[in-house]
Swiss-Prot record:
The gene is rsgA. One of its GO terms (biological process) is ribosomal small subunit biogenesis. Its cofactor is Zn(2+). Belongs to the TRAFAC class YlqF/YawG GTPase family. RsgA subfamily. This is Small ribosomal subunit biogenesis GTPase RsgA. Binds 1 zinc ion per subunit.
Length: 272
């Protein structure tokens, strides 16, 4: 049988196949080869999980595969907004050529942050606890897609899940389906929603980039596009001369914001 992994817990894999769930272990050969199935994987199984089908993409943290879009949930306050953290998320996700959606939460608590660049460049939404309508427009982004929610602890992922489930009469309360109450989720788990799937992930206080400087230089979609006009194929957009680096030229002309370029340089230093 072929099914999709919905949850991994204590060495067991919860697999959905033809509207039924099965809990199995992986065969020893997979473990010996250090091939670890993750949530979102399509797998072959009978009494045991025997094979992982080829993946179209994979994220390391959160560890998920075969997703259609990553929804970055980031707070404008409590925790304080950080363009550096957002750009770190974006570099990791866009490097995998995964579509990005950004949901800015707690917009009512902070109206001072300049997020215009992100609103203009990415599919983005602003939500406020005191504005129910700000959540209603989120329903359609999940339709017929496998979506993964990523973000720090405390940014409001649970609120979003509860709000969209209340706005969609086809589903039960999502947080109940995910086993979420007052406490944050501790495992990566997929559920069916709006003719697609949502993967909820644990929040975290820090995230590391696991790529080379060369990969990072092309990780942002815009950098990947514009770096093709740099003089050198492996331009890092750092110490090269202005006339040789198209990214630097676009920063100078303000087409790429200076704060984003500085975030990139900081990320570049992190992956040395």
């Amino acid at each position: 049988m072929i099914g999709r992994v919905y949850q991994v817990i204590s060495g067991f894999y919860d697999i959905k196949c033809e509207d039924k769930f099965y809990r199995v272990r992986a065969i020893g050969n997979l473990r010996n080869l250090k091939l670890n199935p993750v949530v979102g994987d399509l797998v072959v199984f009978d009494e045991s999980l025997t094979k992982i089908e080829p993946r179209k993409n994979i994220l390391i943290r959160p560890k998920v595969a075969n997703i259609d879009q990553a929804i970055i949930v980031i707070s404008l306050d409590q925790p304080k907004f950080s363009s550096f953290l957002l750009d770190k998320f974006l570099s990791i996700i866009e490097f995998q050529k995964i579509k990005v959606v950004i949901i800015f939460t707690k917009a009512d608590l902070n109206t001072k942050e300049d997020i215009g660049y992100y609103l203009k460049t990415y599919q983005s939404y602003l939500t406020s606890l005191d504005d129910e309508n700000s959540y209603k427009k989120l329903n359609d982004i999940f339709e017929k897609k496998i979506s993964v929610l990523v973000g720090q602890s405390g940014v409001g992922k649970t609120t979003i899940l509860n709000k969209v489930s209340l706005n969609n009469f086809f589903t039960q309360n999502i947080s109940k389906a995910l086993g979420r109450g007052k406490h944050s989720t501790r495992v990566v788990k997929m559920i069916d929603f709006n003719n697609g799937q949502i993967i909820d992930t644990p929040g975290f206080s820090s995230i590391e980039i696991q790529m080379s400087q060369k990969d990072l230089s092309k990780s942002f979609e815009s950098f990947d596009k514009y770096s093709q006009r740099c003089k050198y194929r492996h331009c890092l957009h750092q110490n090269e001369r202005l006339e040789d680096c198209n990214i630097k030229q676009l920063v100078q002309s303000q087409e790429i914001p200076l704060f984003r370029y500085n975030n990139y340089l900081k990320l570049l230093d992190e992956v040395k």
